[in-house]
Structures are given as C-alpha cells and as structure tokens.
Amino acid sequence: MLTPYKHEPFTDFSVEENRSAFEAALKNVEGELGKDYPLVINGERVTTDDKIVSVNPAMKEQVIGVVSKASREIVDDAFKSAETAFHTWKNVNPEERANILIRAAAIIRRRKHEFSAWLVKEAGKPWKEADADTAEAIDFLEYYARQMITLKDGKPVNSREGEHNRYFYTPIGVCVTISPWNFALAIMAGTTVAPIVTGNTVLLKPASTTPVVAAKFVEVLEEAGLPKGVVNFVPGSGTDIGDYLIDHPKTSLITFTGSRDVGVRLYERAAVVHPGQQHLKRVIVEMGGKDTVVVDKDADLDLAAQSIVTSAFGFSGQKCSAGSRAVIHQDVYDVVLEKAVALTKQLSVGEPTAPDVYMGPVVDQGAFSKIMSYIEVGKEEGRLMVGGEGDDSKGFFIQPTIFADVDPHARIMQEEIFGPVVAFSKARDFDHALEIANNTEYGLTGAVITTNRHHIEKAKRDFHVGNLYFNRNCTGAIVGYHPFGGFKMSGTDSKAGGPDYLALHMQAKTVSEMY
C-alpha cells in the first residue's frame, strides 16, 4: 500500500553535512566526465560514428560526455522495438507498471546529489536549482505512479437493468518524447514515464545540449526493472531525425517541451496522415511564455521586488515560467524599481560548482548570442538600470539585466528572450496592469503582488494564464501542488503534474454487456 503523495523536500545546503555530501558528489562526477554513451534500442547498446559532444556551459572546453547519435535507420529499428514491446507492455498490470516508477524514484533519491551534480556540470545549474530539478524528477515518478493506480479501473458510469457498463482507459501506442535542456532531468523524466506508466512505449529524444543526464536516467529505468523495448534512447539533432520522428506512421503520441516556433511546426506536421497510418496523432506541447509579475499600489513592496528578481533571474531566466516582465502601478513604480535594482546588484554570477553562486551560465553559444542581441534591442527600447554585460571567453555568462520604462508593445516586452533580462513597464491602475499582462501571445504563468481582495478576485478571473500565483514569484511549480501548463501559444494546457495529465496518454473505452 503506497503512502499518500508528498513532494520531495529540497536539500538545505546551510547544513554542513549536506554541503559536504554535495561537494563529494561533484568530485565523483568530475571523475566520470568524458565517457561515451550509446543509444539503447530494444535493451541493446548501439554505438554510432556520429556523436553529440556535450560540454559544460560554464567551462566550454570541458567535455561532459560523448553520446551516439541516432540515424533514421536506427530510428526505424527503435520504432519496431517499441511497437513489439507495446503488445506486451500494454497488458502489464498497471500496479506493476507503477511499481517500476516507485523503484526508479527510490534509486534517484539514493543518488540525489549525484544527479544534481550532473545537472550542475551539463546544464550549468547552481546547487539549489539542480537540487530542485532532481526533486521534481522524483516527484513526477511518485505522483504519476499513484495517479495510474487511481485510474487503473476507469471511471464509474451508469448501467440500466439487464446491462453492465464499464468505462476504462487503454494505452495509445508508441510515444515520441522530445525533452528540453532547461529541466534536463525533471521534464525529461516526467514526459518519459507518463507514457510508460499508462502502458505506452517510448522513443526518447533528449535535448542535444543535455543528453548525458538523459542517458543516466535510462539506466535508472533499466535498473528499476523496465522491460527492454519499452523505452528506446534515440538522441540526435532535430535536423536529422526530428521531423522523421514526428512524421513516422507508427507515432501515436508526441510530447514536446521547447520553443514556440518548433512546437507550432511540430503541431502542424503531426496533423498530416501518412501512408500506413491508421490513427490521428495526439500531441502534448509546452512552448514557453512571456510571463508577468504585476505589482499593485497596495502591495508589500519588498515582497514585490524580491518576487520580480526571483522570477526573472533564477537559473539565469532560462525557464518557460520566468518573469521577464514587471508591470507596476505608477504610484509605486519608482520604489519597486529601485528595490529590484538593489537586489539584483547583490546577485552573484559565476561557476555553478561554487555553493553560493546564484546564477550560472546560459546554456550555449546560441543562447548567449541571442540574449546579448536582445540586450542591445533593450538599450533602444528602455533604460538600462543594471547588467547588460556578457562574457563568453570561458563559459556563457550574462549579468542579470533590468530595463526600465519599456513600452508594453516593445519587443523585449513581447518576445521570449529566455535569459536573465526583465523589462519594467508602468501601469495607470490595476485594470491597466492586467491589460498589459494579457497583451502577449503567451499565457503560461503570472504573479500578482497585492493585498486588495477585490483585485485578487479580479485577477483570478481576468489574468489569462495557466498558472497564476499571488504574493510570490511566478516560477517553481511543484508536482501535485501546482499542475503546470499554459494557455494561448504557451501550449495545449496539458497540466503536467496534475490529475488530468495521464489521461492524455490514453484513450477511453466503453464496454456494454447485456445479461
């Protein structure tokens, strides 16, 4: 009997024992760098000549690992493996499938600092961000296991006299999981185990910047007892195999987390029925945001400034939930701006292996160049208050940056930057603040800092985002507590870590029997 779900606690690094344990994990991971990682097809290791070289974004000359790349021919083999495994796996008792997730969670929990250390090295995450990523991965495993047990017998429906009716869920088929680099363990794990616990099989294509963490996770699933062929590990570039995975007639379900442009293109391609395809593909996408922290005139102004800074600069702003817009009532605008600038000047930027560094690097050269180009745009569109500098000589470091007095329709108020940049805009009143908050094509997260109950209720109704927070930052959703997913161009509102999520990976069946 499983205990009720409760989220994995974060590590308190002010405790010397925890700091020492994490430092030891970092040292151990240092000794593991540079190894080769094969593909996994039907439980077999497959090595290719074409490789992905994963590097440390804080120290770009340091190789984290070398991962084999899948070709289209190998992808075909992976589909055959997944299709064959599906015919057996779909009939496995849901509780047995759930137990594999529970065992995988226990393995990661025992090796929590190790996985977090890999995230520090491969994704450039500071200690606390890496620890939260690992904790979230554990949460997805524990939560989805329990959700599957809840759903295993279906839902009650009515029966008439002489008739017995059942309504239950069945798996869909082969799922293609395309996971992001910014939550290289948590989102990758969640979007892999949701399909498998519901009885589907998976082709996992992780982000090319963080494939080593994904390879380590596949090893955990094998150790937990996952049968061969249920998950097939097929890292590769989107150019080489991305479209091929989406277009393949054996693909039944696609789960994607990434940019708006790629997500929209994927959604369009998935609608096409290819020769040999006998089904419509189901698509789950999460595509980012342009998220706003709204500050009312009667807000706690210290809380407001801290919420803006935390939302904007955690993990260098590389979260789809990051608060890249601060919309502030004109009566308190200057005070909140001054407080936020002062807090930002206190933030440390550096090598994330150091325990007290707040911000590490951005993920790669492409991200660095894009963010720096937006900073140049920001200098034309607003008043640079702090930051604005970058250094890619050793790693990809950018200072936390605030622009003030930005027009609500300016590019840096409308376009997702995915970096440590926040734009401040002034609102006439609360209604105007909500109008600005809603004026983007995205609708993922938002926060409102206010003590006005009427305004809280108005924002609940009129602030059009999937995840809305009051009197706190707009990042840091917890599985089972804050089901996560957005409106508009932020995706399909497929609430990850919520009670409806697993049903998206299944199809409902009605059976009516007369007696």
Curated annotation (Swiss-Prot):
InterPro entries per the UniProt record, alphabetical: Ald_DH/histidinol_DH (IPR016161), Ald_DH_C (IPR016163), Ald_DH_CS_CYS (IPR016160), Ald_DH_CS_GLU (IPR029510), Ald_DH_N (IPR016162), Aldehyde_DH_dom (IPR015590), Proline_metab_enzyme (IPR050485), RocA (IPR005932)
Superkingdom: Bacteria
Pathway: Amino-acid degradation; L-proline degradation into L-glutamate; L-glutamate from L-proline: step 2/2
GO biological process: glutamate biosynthetic process; proline catabolic process to glutamate
Chain ranges passing through the membrane: none
EC annotation from Swiss-Prot or TrEMBL: 1.2.1.88
EC class name: oxidoreductase
Active site residues of this protein: E286, C320
Keywords: NAD, Oxidoreductase
Catalyzed reactions: L-glutamate 5-semialdehyde + NAD(+) + H2O = L-glutamate + NADH + 2 H(+)
GO molecular function: 1-pyrroline-5-carboxylate dehydrogenase activity
GO CC terms of this entry: cytoplasmic side of plasma membrane
CDD domains per the UniProt record, alphabetical: ALDH_PutA-P5CDH-RocA
Gene3D superfamilies for the chain: Aldehyde Dehydrogenase, Chain A, domain 1 (3.40.605.10), Aldehyde Dehydrogenase, Chain A, domain 2 (3.40.309.10)
UniProt family annotation: Belongs to the aldehyde dehydrogenase family. RocA subfamily.
Annotated HAMAP family: RocA (MF_00733)
Protein name: 1-pyrroline-5-carboxylate dehydrogenase 2
Organism, as annotated: Halalkalibacterium halodurans (strain ATCC BAA-125 / DSM 18197 / FERM 7344 / JCM 9153 / C-125)
Encoding gene per record: rocA2
